[in-house]
Amino acid sequence: NRIDQLASQLTSNVRAANSTYPTSMREYEQRRDYQNNAIINCEQILKELQRIVEIFEVDVNTYGRYVNAIDREIGLIKKWRQRDNKIKAYLQGNV
């Protein structure tokens, strides 16, 4: 199903970003792209859950813990990107 596909893509993007330690700006940008795609996957999963609630008239509270977990994941990825700004500054020679 769609949520399963998106979750698989999310996992792949996080793993790809995590397996790359940037030593050049190109690698930094590639890692950033994976991180951004992971955030997009999270947003897509949230949208699919919302669609399920609307179409099947499911109690929205049924998915509350999943929504919270996905929101937490988005926050963690965003913090990760912020920490990577130090790598970017180093690669640009601004350290």
What are these regions (language model features)?
Residues 1-95:
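Amphipathic alpha-helical assembly/interaction segments
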